[in-house]
Amino acid sequence: MPLVSISDAQRVPIQNANVVATVYHGLPLDLHQPTFNPRGGYLAFLGRISPEKGVDRAVKVARTFGIPLKIAAKVDRVDEAYFREQIAPLLKGPDLQFIGEIDEQEKTDFLGQALALMFLIDWPEPFGMSMIEAMACGTPVLALRRGSVEEVVEDGLTGHIVDSIEEATVTLPRVMALDRRAVRRRFEDRFSATRMANEYVRVYNSLLVRTNVKLVPNQAEPLHTTAAELANEPSESIH
């Protein structure tokens, strides 16, 4: 069966699979509005509380550099003990704020007002939606070189990629100084939902070429996907 990967990194552990293309995830351009002059004065962690997601490393970098850290994350039942025993003790003090899980609307303000997103993972992340969500808000990313990070973050343009926590601490000022307008532009160029949909259509058409069937009769007509349109469309998700 033909498969589509969400990053080239995702192919590494499944090299015998019939992967015919890589299509990066995308977001509607109007889902998050960018903030070019953030006033929050904090670093952001967005995701899930688990050992591989690196919230403890984000805490270490933030405290070493002396910048507050806000953590918007869910705690799955399987990770409750890890959160209680390893993370909760780190969250004492005015410089750290645990917000919990947030919705899409809250993400815009949370990420937009942040100086940078901390993406200090310790596993081969196949994509990492929070990175492009931050970019949509104009917020640069500080990330460890794992999994798909090098495919998503353009080093020196939409963020910086590092190889250690020590390097992350030294690099943080350069991340915060990046041009937020350029970060948003690159998000629009590379990670729109329209681009993603059109790439899937091209893949599907290429698989159907032997039957002379086209999935989209007029390929010249672009697909337009906005947050409002998605809200009105029924959808199915595979988890």
Q: Model-found features: residue ranges?
A:
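Nucleotide-activated donor-binding/catalytic signature segment of Leloir-type glycosyltransferases, i.e.
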Residues: 73, 84-105
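Short acidic/histidine- and often glycine-rich active-site loop of Leloir-type glycosyltransferases
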Residues: 145-156, 160-163
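Conserved donor-binding/catalytic core segment of Leloir-type glycosyltransferases
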Residues: 2-4, 17-74
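C-terminal "capping" alpha-helix adjacent to the active site of nucleotide-linked donor transferases
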Residues: 160-182
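Acidic donor-binding loop of glycosyltransferase active sites
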Residues: 112-126, 139
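Short glycine/serine-rich donor-binding loops of glycosyltransferases
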Residues: 128-131, 149
